[in-house]
Amino acid sequence: MADERNPNQIIRKDARNCFVESLSDAFGNSRAHFAFATYDLSKPAGHRQTNSIHIYISIPELLELCRKLSCGELRYIMQQKKQTGDSKPIQEWLGGTSAEKLRQYGKARPDGKSLSRVCKLLVGQKTDFLLIADSGPGDKDVKGLIVPRFGNKPENHVAVSMTYDALSELLLMTKMHYESWLTAWYLSQTHSGQQQNHVPANNKPPAKYSFQAGVSECSCEKMF
């Protein structure tokens, strides 16, 4: 069973027939990669996955969320939203792949639209948090952002219920692994004799990735 583990997996959190896992394969692009999936155990092995959504969050946004978690601000926000019945997301990340890129990858949608992916962190009614990922049709606006056009009917939907501790483990383990990766990067620069003042993000990611940045939301989405 150990051989089946994704070598890039940092940590995985399971809920009922779904999970989210944090992966380390996008650190070089200054992104944290969260893979969401649902599954049906009644189906044959190899065909059990029913939804799959990849969400990429910028490292600065991840670190800011970890700061809120560590200082207690996130717990305070959660408690206030529960008391007032506020159902608005604590945080939301927008991403996707444009229709042009989909055509380049040979993955054009039948409707000709872009592929939108959205991730939301909300306060749950029966648990502390819900970490939700949705995907479906979208349109690219004048700023190049992929705007979702699926309303409340996404083509793929994964909602992972999490306790405060579970979310803490997911975020802080990801932060710790990124910091370890960053330390290793600096050491590699020292040993190679290179002198650089900053970590260079890969401005030209592999073709299977598509990036989008917003005013307060930033993510990149993986093609599959």
Positions of PLM-derived features:
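A short, structured beta-strand/loop element
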Residues: 25-44, 130-143
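DNA replication sliding-clamp ring fold and its partner-interaction surfaces
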Residues: 54-81, 161-187
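Short, solvent-exposed interaction modules
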Residues: 87-157
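Mixed-charge, glycine-accented linear interaction segment located at domain edges/termini
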Residues: 137-224
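A cross-kingdom feature marking solvent-exposed beta-strand/loop segments within repeated
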Residues: 38-58, 143-160
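An N-terminus-focused feature that recognizes amino-terminal "leader" regions
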Residues: 1-27, 210, 217-223
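Short, low-complexity cationic-aromatic patches
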Residues: 20-28, 55-59, 120-125, 158-166
